[in-house]
Regions:
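Catalytic core of nucleotide-activated saccharide and alditol-phosphate transferases
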Residues: 95-175
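N-terminal pre-catalytic "stem/leader" segment of glycosyltransferase-like enzymes
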Residues: 1-110, 116, 122, 127-128
Length: 175
């Protein structure tokens, strides 16, 4: 029986979908809960959400997205592993509910803790937290990993065929 892995992420640009595709290529029963894929049921729900945000200062869509995650997990059943990318967009309360659907609950941080705080998620929520930020790995004891790139390898182009005159690579940190 193949391992069951669920990926939960916002995935604005369909970048994380490629992770699930690669897992499936390896024979893993993988599925993606795309939080950004949540849609209002109708225009009345959209108007009610806008009213709540403007008048009450509360955004019901945030809670509905989290309920959507639980609905999808209820439908798909218990998973061998669940990986959440950018866990700060989900409340602790919902993380603890999600965790009941798996034996191994992990998080991957797309950014440093200084830019996207996860302090509220450090105690008893995740079995493992992965980060590419060396300072965060050292300070919080996260597991070090790299960023990933879903692009297929391309053959090296002959220098004679290169038309660009410049290449610029930058990083704002100390690397």
């Amino acid at each position: 029986m193949p391992q069951k892995i669920c990926l939960i992420s916002f995935d604005h640009w369909n970048y994380d979908k490629h992770i699930v595709d690669k897992l499936k290529e390896k024979g893993i029963d993988a599925f993606h809960i795309k939080i950004g894929g949540f849609k209002y049921k109708n225009n009345a729900a959209r108007i009610a959400n806008s009213f709540s945000k403007i008048v009450l200062g509360k955004n019901p869509k945030i809670q509905k997205r989290q309920e959507y995650i639980l609905e999808m997990l209820e439908k798909m059943g218990v998973q061998d592993q669940i990986l959440v990318i950018n866990p700060e967009v989900i409340s602790v309360e919902y993380h603890l509910k999600i965790k009941k659907y798996t034996q191994k609950y992990s998080a991957y941080l797309y950014d440093s803790v200084s830019r996207c705080p996860v302090d509220h998620l450090l105690e008893g929520v995740f079995d493992e937290i992965y980060s590419f930020d060396k300072d965060d790995v050292k300070k919080y004891g996260f597991k070090e990993t790299t960023n990933y790139n879903y692009l297929e390898k391309q053959p090296i182009t002959s220098p004679d065929l290169i038309k660009n005159q410049a290449l610029y690579i930058a990083s704002f940190d100390n690397r």
